[in-house]
Amino acid sequence: AKMKADPLNKLHWRRTPARLQAEVIRDSLLEMSGLLDTKMYGAGTLDERMKRRSIYFMIKRSKLIPTMQLFDSPEPLVSQGSRPSTIIAPQALHFMNNAQVREAAVALAGQFEKKTEDGDAISLAYQTVVGREPTISEKKSISEFMNAQAESYKAGGRNDARKLALADLAQVLFGLNEFIYVN
């Protein structure tokens, strides 16, 4: 009915999902994991491993920060009235393979590990990363995933199998559209 009344969305009754900006994605990862250095002011840096907010990155045209470029940070050579927002496969691969994303996931897992049961940890992970409770089917699938991951880590001789399985869960949640898009 709403679509018939306003097919062009002139009354703004629906919203097109928008991807978060590069700086917001990076800062959110650091904040959720407890790794964010909230120190204000001071010199900027080109070191991508820095734990301060992304606003403290220096812009050097000959040495751009790959993660920021991947998520469409502003081009420093030209003036831009608005940012483009691309959706490309390397963005998803970034959440699967980036060392900083893994570091944030392990730190976040350390917070979840304090929960006594995996079900509680799964709910806490969902609430922290995507802001909602998991559905029953999501909880079941993730519980199976975490059990398989923990068994794999145990078979590899790891003593911290549960924490690593929780880190895998956090890393999966970081890659969800619900984390990087605003509806």
Regions found by a protein language model. Name each.
Residues 1-129, 133-135, 167, 173-183:
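An acidic, gly/pro-interrupted, aromatic-rich
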Residues 129, 150-153:
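Short amphipathic alpha-helical interaction patches enriched in hydrophobic/aromatic residues
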Residues 137, 141-142, 162, 166:
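Long, internal low-complexity/basic segments
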Residues 140-151:
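Amphipathic alpha-helical segments that form the core helices of the histone-fold
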Residues 152-178:
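Charge-dense polyanion-binding interfaces
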